[in-house]
Amino acid sequence: MVNSLRLGDDDLVPVDYTDLLDKILGVLQSQNPFSRSSDNYRLVIDIDAIANEVSQLQIIPPLGSFERQAHSATVNFPAEVEVRFRSQIRQIREYLRQHLETILGGDDAVERFVASLIVPLDSTYFRGGGTELGFKYNFPRHSTLEKKKLTLQRLDSSTRAILKLHKLTISVRNSDIFQQQLREGLKKYINENTDNKEDRENLTDRLDEIVQDESSNFHKLIRLVDKETLGKLNKEAKITYLEYLLENIRSNSTDRVGIIYLQDLIRRLRLIEEYISDIDKSDGDYEVNYAGVRVNYRDIFSRAEVLDILPIVPIVAGYLGESTDTHRSERKFIFGLKIKFDNPVQARGGDDVFEYNLNLLNPDSDEQKTELAEDFNREKFVRKVLKIALLYYFVFASRSNPLANDYNPESEGNYQPRESFESVVMPVLSGSDEERKQQILRGIIRGLNQYNIKVKIDRLKQLLKGFLDRETILPPRTESRHINIKRGILEQIDDTLTTGKFFNDILERNPKQALQYITVENARVNPRAICQLPVNITIEDIRYFPTDERQSFSMEYNIKGINALPVLLTPRGAISKDTYAKHFNTKLVVFRYENQRLKSDGGLPPAEAFVYKFTMLLLSYMCLKILAENWGKNLFIPMVRLHEGDHNNPSPSEKFMAHLSKTLSHLLSEKYRCNSQGFRIKHPPKKFTIGNGLSSLYSILPKKFRFDNVQLSPELDNLAIIVVSSRESDARKGNANRFQRKASLIGEIVGINRQEDGSIQVEMLKTFSENYSVTHLYTQPSILEDAMSQLYEQGYRNFAYISQAPYTSTLHITKTDEDEDLFFMSKSLIRTLKGERRDIKIYPIFFDKYFVRSFEQHRGESFYIQDIMELSNLADDPNQESVMFFNLFNGIKVDQQGDKNFYNGVISYSTLLHIYQGILDDKDIHQDLIYDGLTKDTLLHYLTIFHFSRYEARQNISLKLDPYERIIGDDSVGALSIFSHTGGSANFNSLAFLNKVRELDNEVDNNDW
């Protein structure tokens, strides 16, 4: 059988799982995955054996020959494939149901047996101390919880600050007239380079044509500047921040050597910019190649993130606001700053950043050999290797050894890395002798080790940390810069006269490569620039001070009426077998699997691994749905995972099962409640580890809060929190049009309700996920529309609608529909949520995390900050678009090897102002989120207790810093649901796929809450 996939008009790669599903059906016909224990206490499900057998069969790849054209491909079914898919899924479900009935004795027996496994959570069956592996827990009441208020204002001169934030503000002027300036710059170029009136008139007419044509390269350049320049400004801000620190350290430190190292780091970073921007060099002078992959250094080092692989480098982290001043034609972007301190990299079992990247650079390392052997990842890896080679050479190459007896730190400033790089390294990397290239890379590593560069890095780290720990408040600093569009992006005037093209072909082929012609430089007139935008970069030292305001409250579980169906995911290894026998001899559903299937050495090859994972996720989901189908929202499915691997040497199979359990938990929580938690058992886990794990497992259960002397707004007796995110499921490589993609809308709804006894209950109402074209994702997603209707029917009138910050990447130069940049905060989507319901309030809120340095230890303490950082003129400024109104901080530092715990995270909440005229009442947003008052206090109180409700520790309870991590971020269900297709070059979104499967289950009843 050969699939007959053809590319359609939607510019997406089609998928066809027909053959794979047929193979699953074939194996499933003859194998029953279900068995039960002799005491009838456990249902054992062996999907692993079926998945492994299916993986050994010859299967037509779901993407046919088109995989390399797809960035992701999951649910873009041709019509005829869709029909077969629905039939096959129903057939698989029927086979599973029949197998289950076979071992249990008929249809009614399935329901009876499942009922025998389900136990009320408040029964003695689940009661225990919470210190032993298993499901027993004491569901403790916490009666002495407290939150404390911090403020930006020092109450008196003796008050010591608790937190330090370094704030970055980037102010861009004239962005609203950039198109006009670009046109004038091109007209000036025409006038300077044409000899006669006729040529000038012809080219001016041609210029007018491309200005009018929205699809022209003129507008492509404008869009490129709009979307990519803020990243380049952030890159410049990183170096400016180092200069800011150096300026203040010089007058406050006696560490002469450390100061020299910081000064030299800045010098070398500037040398890279000078080298890449050298006007006397052509693009070809930067061409290098390695392992068959060609790279242009000018292109690579024009990217915003290029410095981030350094061991010590500032990081722009955390979105703090954004505003527009139309009178001054100025737009401000506000961020947090922190420094990366050569932290350990988990992927290498604790190697720090410097050693990790040297290992990638090393031609003899296992990592480089493995990556170069895999075609699908080779280009990306080689780009990284060549980037490390230049960056580490320019920043660290030296002839001065800090451990030598005659070492003179001043000599560091005399070394010129550019000269030796151009004379020694570039001729080799631009040539064709692969052996010499490997020798050069080995030589770079040898030199960095021989001259003990790590000693210098550690000294610099010590200097910066010591300075950042000081309590002296630093004065602000503002630096002026220009964004320059260089003439190098233009064709020669004679060629333009012949072809009518003003711009280099690079803008047509790959716009991002044209970033090399967009530079950020010191503020001065540049005759080689087509046009310039003025920019200010401001760095400020912000402090948070304690106050006497605090609130006390208690928290307890409300598990009455909740029934539990425990599930265990366990490897077949000896350690797991012993743990299972000792701690899990109880009522539960058991999924057993072989944890060696996916190991890199001797495990399944990539194509077979995809088939195995696909089969595991499909059948495990369908099995659990069959077991739970007759139970309502009061069913809780706690999943416990046993892991024989450890943090430094995790099992790939166990990691996959962890990700799978998160995906299953999200899907099942649409109708029930489900959560998963893993326990590492290579060594017997400690009691507090078990307690924290069980607390995490049960963190989504309803909780009731009681307060002392807290006044709440009578208008806010309830609040629904709706959290949304998305994850791409289908997209073509090289297609920059994000509207020609498909994605999964992912979310969660939490209800906060005031009870008759005066307590406040917080509970997860449901999760949701559904697939959409991106065109509809941010405008009229029906799943959100339905959720709002259902919440309204349940009595909710106040809605905190939360997503991650949408305003972080563009200068907003283009005059396109502003909804494109608002994503989940688009006016179209907010209008959909509002509908015709005039008696509801929707608060558009987005959150982010920024980082601060804490001067004290605050274990188990919780703080809130509700000062408005950018308060000036807020009431009178109709152009203010985004303002941060609330911050939460818990003082907890992560105990782990290295220095990742130097900073503390702070969660920020921001809202959008003057965006939704005619849809939402802007007065509500001002009065309820911005200005102090009872309504604002109540809303922020509700948000705070939601953070407390998601705590994942058994003792020293404080608010959970990021309660949205299941929906948004690197550890979200959307991120964890991704794995590679058979060829390894395209992504498969398992959540999006199961959404498609779930559609069949929900056809009869998709409104059951």
How would you name each of these model-derived features?
Residues 2-477, 481-487, 501, 505-510, ...:
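Long, contiguous domain-sized segments
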